[in-house]
Amino acid sequence: MTTGDCCHLPGSLCDCSGSPAFSKVVEATGLGPPQYVAQVTSRDGRLLSTVIRALDTPSDGPFCRICHEGANGECLLSPCGCTGTLGAVHKSCLEKWLSSSNTSYCELCHTEFAVEKRPRPLTEWLKDPGPRTEKRTLCCDMVCFLFITPLAAISGWLCLRGAQDHLRLHSQLEAVGLIALTIALFTIYVLWTLVSFRYHCQLYSEWRKTNQKVRLKIREADSPEGPQHSPLAAGLLKKVAEETPV
């Protein structure tokens, strides 16, 4: 991942103040105090996150790098090798991020997380199979299946009854024609059912691979209740100690 012309998210301004893009952003904000804008993008250019923070406003404490909220409702963790404000993250936010991005590592420091992936149930796929075209195709195929199945069964039964009647009347040509029609009807029905079923099974398999429930396994060293301080907490304590006047 990259952060435009800056390698850090808000809060780590030491390496960003000298860049031209940073100065342009600060001067362009004429309303209120100067602000710092950070845009986190992936390697393919997709915008993943944008944060705007005032430069002259001191931070109240560490905040989650995904939702940019503090530790009021949920404790902040430091599960990867990122330090500073990049190292703090909520467990729920990170699980949602890993689930939506279909990854199991930090996209900044490439640290592999210990995760447990569980496939989502079939009912969720039936409610939301993906794009609108796939949803429309699924609904149409289900309606056609419910309509064609009894129609094919009734048509086949009528053809067989007619073939029996023609055999009793010694009309073998008509009986053979009705039997051939029944076989053709059921062949087309079975082929259409198999093709449609295979197509939707492939869609469900792809959806299942990219839509999984990710559960982050927290190690003792990453937990805020562990015996040792995390790198984030150690850095904050060191910073506070340096800024405290003697």
UniProtKB/Swiss-Prot annotation:
It is a multi-pass membrane protein. Keywords: Cell membrane, Cytoplasm, Endocytosis, Endoplasmic reticulum, Endosome, Golgi apparatus, Lysosome, Membrane, Metal-binding, Transferase, Transmembrane, Transmembrane helix, Ubl conjugation pathway, Zinc, Zinc-finger. One of its GO terms (cellular component) is endoplasmic reticulum. GO terms for biological process: antibacterial innate immune response; antiviral innate immune response; endocytosis; positive regulation of lysosomal protein catabolic process; protein ubiquitination; suppression of viral release by host. A zinc finger (RING-CH-type) spans 56-116. The keyword Cell cycle does not apply. Interacts with STX6; the interaction promotes MARCHF2-mediated ubiquitination and degradation of CFTR. Interacts with MARCHF3. Interacts with GOPC/CAL; the interaction leads to CFTR ubiquitination and degradation. Interacts with CFTR; the interaction leads to CFTR ubiqtuitination and degradation. Interacts (via PDZ domain) with DLG1 (via PDZ domains); the interaction leads to DLG1 ubiqtuitination and degradation. Interacts with ERGIC3. Interacts with ADRB2. E3 ubiquitin-protein ligase that may mediate ubiquitination of TFRC and CD86, and promote their subsequent endocytosis and sorting to lysosomes via multivesicular bodies. E3 ubiquitin ligases accept ubiquitin from an E2 ubiquitin-conjugating enzyme in the form of a thioester and then directly transfer the ubiquitin to targeted substrates. Together with GOPC/CAL mediates the ubiquitination and lysosomal degradation of CFTR. Ubiquitinates and therefore mediates the degradation of DLG1. (Microbial infection) Positively regulates the degradation of Vesicular stomatitis virus (VSV) G protein via the lysosomal degradation pathway. Represses HIV-1 viral production and may inhibit the translocation of HIV-1 env to the cell surface, resulting in decreased viral cell-cell transmission. This is E3 ubiquitin-protein ligase MARCHF2. It comes from Homo sapiens (Human).
